[in-house]
């Protein structure tokens, strides 16, 4: 429900920005350390008290639900935190903006000491964090990996073709 409310609000906001011919920001970054989203989104929509009250009437605590959400660790430091703050600032100032990145299967790694040695483990953030993602399979494109390029000139027309590549849909 919360994601649906946010999606509808974003659609209305972008429609208005386009109607006013406002410029839009598209921010591409490899890392976004957004933190946990549920608390932030409830607060920004002004719904935290209402949801807390509704849950309380069912014998549940909102704080316990907050603690179930994994931290979307999609980066490991300054760059990811800066990107998140930048987007948060743009949203707060009501600029039409969208952040783009790769959807990592694993976030930043977790560390654990085993027999006195540091061991890195994958951060499985998707099982509880994918609720905020919105798939758009109709926008998928073919991405080529490996292979080689063949360059051709046909008069004044130049073309490059990728040969023997591994193709994936992304």
Task: List where the protein language model places each region.
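A conserved ligand/cofactor-binding region detector
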Residues: 1-170
């Amino acid at each position: 429900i919360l994601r649906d409310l946010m999606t509808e609000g974003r659609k209305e906001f972008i429609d208005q920005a386009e109607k006013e011919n406002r410029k839009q920001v598209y921010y591409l970054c490899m890392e976004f350390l957004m933190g946990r989203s549920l608390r932030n989104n409830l607060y920004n929509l002004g719904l935290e008290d209402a949801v807390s009250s509704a849950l309380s009437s069912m014998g549940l605590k909102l704080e316990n639900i907050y603690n179930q959400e994994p931290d979307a660790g999609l980066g490991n430091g300054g760059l990811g935190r800066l990107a998140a703050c930048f987007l948060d600032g743009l949203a707060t100032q009501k600029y039409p903006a969208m952040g783009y990145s790769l959807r990592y299967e694993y976030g930043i790694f977790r560390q654990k000491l085993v027999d006195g040695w540091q061991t890195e483990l994958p951060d499985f953030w998707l099982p509880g964090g994918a609720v905020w993602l919105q798939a758009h399979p109709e926008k998928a494109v073919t991405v080529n990996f490996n292979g080689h390029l063949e360059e051709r000139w046909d008069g004044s027309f130049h073309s490059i073709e990728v040969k023997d590549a591994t193709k994936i849909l992304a």
